Amino acid sequence: MELDQNATEKVKAMFTAIDELLYEQKPSVHTQSLQKECQQWASSFPHLRILGRQIITSSEGYGLYPRSPSAVSASHEAILPQERESTIFGIRGKKLHFSSSYKASPSTKASGSSADGEEADCIIFSEGIIEEYLAFDHTDMEEGFHGNKSEAATEKQKLGYPPIAPFYCMKEDVLAYVFDNVWSKAVGCMEQLTRSHWEGFASDDESNVEITRLDSGSPYMLNEQQPLVLPRVPQSKVMSVTSNPMNFCQASGHQPNVNGLLIHGMPLQPRNLSLMDKLLDLDDKLLMRPGSSSVLSNRNWPNRAMELSTSSLSYTTQSARRRNPPPRTLHPISTSHSRTGTPWPAEEILRGPRLPMTADSLSSPSPMTMGRNNLLPPIGTADVEHLSILGSQRPTKPHGDSSRARSAAVDEPNQQPQERLLLPVFSRPNTTQSFLPETQYRSSCASECPHHARPGRGSAGPQSHGSTKPQSRGGPISRTRQ
């Protein structure tokens, strides 16, 4: 600690001697070498002058920053021109107090108003905490061009600094405001030109425009946001959307294998979809009437059978989502199209193993492919008789249990014979299968019918029919009404 204190005192005494030599011209033992060095500097650089005095160190929080040394030296040359000598190292200045450091000295006031203006413009006094932030406007660069502001502006743009000074910030704000107004007017003019150019090549057919606006099922119009005021669409763009109906159908979702089916009349698809929606809504209204396993689509519509077959494949994905959720109550049979009739054994018990899924049955289509909604067209009487044979074989299957069909036989004993012919095939709208091939019926019924034949109940249904047809592999004989 004593060594540090002694070293500090020696350094402090050295700086004090230097200050006395520079500002008070008091020689001492410690400043002899400094005097020799100053003489060498004065002889080598006769134009070098040291003016002013350091008031306080910059670490105290404030200090004086001269803008340009040339302006300060010029002001002092006007004050003391007679004391300047080329061979003498001159030090000129006055000792000021800290309280009045920011005020001008009396000698400075007597020098004239011009010198006061220059010193006030050239010296900046700052007090307080100085942040490390540099802001400059390159005023010296602008003064160097002598009034040529365009060249100075190009030089500033090359530097890449943002506008920092308040003047340039206001300038940028004004330019941005002017640009916004001009750009809004330009966009308005361009919008009018675009609309006029669009309407010039548009077609006069307004129905095509309505098709493109109202066709919500089109894959090309799903993600487009239509403006409030839409100009007329040209005929070429409308035809590009509606010209290829097969691509229009394939893009709507995954379609099953439709080899062997006759598909025609695809432009009628929107009408058929609306018809199927009405049928499904009618089914949903009748959910609160339990005790039946009939479907409203079992009615015979010979004129619309082909139309329904064209839309059944494309409607599979939509109907599956509405039919496959939780099991629902079965529908009634006694509708406006039903009539009274004798009971049938197939209405009482339906037993048998679960048939394969839709994807398995669709892989191998057959001529007897049948949908659950009676979507295939009626072909002839022979096929109806064949369906009756298949229907008479299914009640004898021993496996599984179907409470839906049992409830239908108990609650609704009087049914129409024509509806009972297709009841075993189309009476389960909530199951997973949608197409039941002929080979599966034959293989499952031929092995189980001989062991579980019921003559008492099997003779009740066929007595009301006219024509008979024997079965190919053995089993009960079914009759149909013509």
Swiss-Prot record:
Q: Does the keyword Transferase apply?
A: no
Q: Name one GO cellular component term.
A: cilium
Residue ranges of region Disordered? 314-344, 356-379, 391-482
UniProt feature, compositional bias: Polar residues: 332-341, 428-446, 461-471
What Pfam families does its record include?
DUF3719 (PF12516)
Do the record's keywords include Repeat?
no
InterPro entries (alphabetical): DUF3719, FAM149
Q: Where in the cell is it found?
A: Cell projection, Cilium
Q: What keywords are annotated for this sequence in UniProt?
A: Cell projection, Cilium, Cilium biogenesis/degradation
Q: What is its main location?
A: other
Q: Which domain of life is it from?
A: Eukaryota
List GO BP terms, alphabetically: cilium assembly; protein localization to cilium
Q: Self-association or partners: how does it assemble? A: Interacts with TBC1D32; may play a role in cilium assembly.
According to its UniProt entry, what is the function of this protein?
Involved in the localization of proteins to the cilium and cilium assembly. Indirectly regulates the signaling functions of the cilium, being required for normal SHH/smoothened signaling and proper development.
Q: Which family does the UniProt entry place this protein in?
A: Belongs to the FAM149 family.
Record's protein name: Primary cilium assembly protein FAM149B1
Q: What is the lineage of its organism?
A: Eukaryota, Metazoa, Chordata, Craniata, Vertebrata
- UniProt lists the gene as Fam149b1
